[in-house]
Amino acid sequence: DWGFLEKLLDQVQEHSTVVGKIWLTVLFIFRILILGLAGESVWGDEQSDFECNTAQPGCTNVCYDQAFPISHIPYWVLQFLFVSTPTLVYLGHVIYLSRREERLRQKEGELRALPDKDPRVERALAGIERQMAKISVA
């Protein structure tokens, strides 16, 4: 659903400073671009170029596995996860803030809909406004 992604990016823009917006975008794109460009040449098919010193069938696979016991693909996936983790953590924080803000707005609407102006309701509304001020960047 593209609507979720659009809402998430709008929230990121709302909760970021100008420097943060540029930093997040450039750094994430740069990291993924470098990883994608370097990934093929660094973690490409090395086994086809590997030569075995005997003509025995299956020797190339056994020799390659002996020389390189761990596949390069898990390293590439691990690096991709490490590269994207800071951005994903920030996006998770933005999702948390937007949901918290949504709950506070809903609670505020429910309290404002009450017919009586009870002092407890006024205090609760003031508390919600303070919490909303903490969430807002502006």
Swiss-Prot record:
Subcellular location: Cell membrane; Cell junction, Gap junction
One GO term describing the cellular component: connexin complex
SMART domains: CNX
Listed transmembrane segments: 17-39, 75-97
GO process terms (BP): cell communication
Record bears the keyword Transmembrane: yes
Pfam family, one: Connexin
UniProt keyword list: Cell junction, Cell membrane, Gap junction, Membrane, Transmembrane, Transmembrane helix
Ranges of the Extracellular topological domain: 40-74
Cytoplasmic face of the membrane: 1-16, 98-138
Main location: membrane
Task performed by this protein: One gap junction consists of a cluster of closely packed pairs of transmembrane channels, the connexons, through which materials of low MW diffuse from one cell to a neighboring cell.
Quaternary assembly: A connexon is composed of a hexamer of connexins.
Family designation: Belongs to the connexin family. Alpha-type (group II) subfamily.
Protein name, UniProt field: Gap junction alpha-4 protein
Organism: Sus scrofa
Gene giving rise to this polypeptide: GJA4
